[in-house]
């Protein structure tokens, strides 16, 4: 991700700082480099005059229109925007070097609240979501990866094991207060 702070990317990068996936990425950056290191990276990115968007899909649309060279988005937005437009977009998916924070893998989870009034129904829903048939549909329809069936992968993408995600404790990424405060401090939100 450090290469994005180089002057060659001035005004050519799109980000969505209010988006939860970008904030999870910044939380991982804080975890990896500490708050001062994350602030330094954000300050360098801001100095490079990135284009700010509300949503990842807007970044993909801007790359497709030739308004940006690249954007930091979740990979599945390429398919989402292509589907909405009814054609392939010019934006392409690329990955950072192995272990780079730019390869962060966000996850979605499900659980049953202790206070649930319908624990049996909630557990059935989770079992359904984790079933092989649902996971296959999840991969084919949303173009996201399955952590339950890692051998499944979205079409035209490398296997998850080949992406070489950074070592990040994902359980720490849910608390976004520190991240949001840092984004406010550097003037991104």
What is each residue range found by the language model?
Residues 69-90:
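A ligand-binding cleft/hinge motif common to bilobed small-molecule-binding domains
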Residues 17, 75-76, 141-142:
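Short secondary-structure boundary segments
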Residues 59-60, 68, 78, 122, ...:
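Short, hydrophobic alpha-helical packing/hinge segments within bilobed ligand-binding/sensory domains
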Residues 42-46, 52-53, 88-114:
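Periplasmic-binding protein-like
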Residues 1-68, 101:
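Extracytoplasmic ligand-binding site segments that recognize negatively charged/polar headgroups
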Residues 153-189:
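Extracellular/periplasmic bilobal clamshell ligand-binding domains
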Residues 6-10, 30-34, 47-50, 64, ...:
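Sec-exported extracytoplasmic/periplasmic mature domains
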Residues 108-167:
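Mature extracytoplasmic/periplasmic domains
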């Amino acid at each position: 991700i450090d290469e994005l702070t180089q002057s060659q990317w001035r005004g050519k990068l799109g980000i969505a700082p209010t988006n939860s996936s970008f904030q999870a990425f910044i939380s991982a950056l804080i975890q990896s480099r500490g708050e001062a290191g994350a602030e330094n990276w954000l300050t360098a990115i801001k100095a490079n005059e990135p284009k700010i968007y509300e949503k990842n899909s807007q970044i993909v649309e801007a790359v497709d229109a030739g308004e940006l060279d690249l954007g930091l988005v979740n990979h599945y937005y390429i398919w989402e925007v292509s589907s909405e437009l009814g054609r392939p977009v010019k934006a392409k998916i690329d990955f950072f070097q192995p272990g780079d924070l730019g390869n962060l893998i966000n996850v979605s989870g499900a659980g049953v609240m202790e206070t649930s009034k319908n624990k049996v129904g909630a557990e059935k829903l989770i079992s359904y979501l984790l079933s092989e048939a649902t996971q296959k549909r999840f991969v084919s329809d949303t173009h996201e990866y399955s952590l339950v069936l890692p051998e499944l992968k979205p079409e035209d993408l490398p296997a998850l094991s080949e992406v070489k995600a950074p070592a990040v404790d994902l359980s720490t990424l849910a608390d976004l207060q520190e991240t949001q405060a840092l984004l406010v401090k550097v003037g991104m939100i």
